[in-house]
């Protein structure tokens, strides 16, 4: 079996000799990039890096996308654009492969139950209002995590050191429950991230979420639209609404500027995808889809590009057609 893009590129990084680097670059081009350019490619419009709650750096994510024969990749970190900014500055990009990278974000909206996330595609990363809001959301993420830490200390006697807290507050990414799950595993309070969520973090989050200073969905839609982006409702299944309730909120969101819906997602069954596709067509919404890939330690059963148990394989989306116009 041939080496992956990541393995070859890691070898290149170990060399300081220019000739060795040039040789490895040729190997990388021949063994990875050229076959990638000739291959039939798929689309993944929902991914996360370590700038939010993913495992991989933007560079590592793009390498993996090349290995997975992904032709279009949207980086949609939670409530931050720092990861995609790094890609756009070419500070964290590998040898040009022709892969298409879409500017994206996933904003969290306040909701009484379930989870409401709104994806934004094609956003202007230099938009002043967007960047100001990112600072506010960064501060909110710190306060939210500190509230959850206090809750699990009260409920379960779990305490983390001052150094752990200091490291979290000074991290270069928005904080979230996976950061706490990592600490729970580190100190033996849980065996896996999911174990930490099941034992402590879901309950603590539910107890503290009402004090959250999250955005209303109207503000999410406005923020994305005003930054030149296209707002899309992410994984609608996570709203945990009845069909009647879902259609009521969907119509309200459309009236406030919602333009698309994530039909294809790792958590959706075939029947659910068919239903959301019908809804998209009925209400004139753009169709999107993606794996919602976070990485192996966060979601070990979800693969980049193909989702859970290969339940998605996207080759065409009306959302992408709109972005290309």
What do these predicted regions represent?
Residues 172-236:
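Conserved acidic, metal-coordinating active-site core of Asp-based
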Residues 139-167:
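Conserved phosphoryl-transfer catalytic core
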Residues 110-136, 140, 186-206, 303-324:
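Active-site gating loops and adjacent loop-to-helix segments of metal-dependent hydrolytic enzymes
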Residues 85, 146-154, 182-185, 222:
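A broadly conserved amphipathic alpha-helix scaffold signal in soluble, globular proteins
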Residues 81, 170-178, 270:
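An alpha-helix initiation/capping motif
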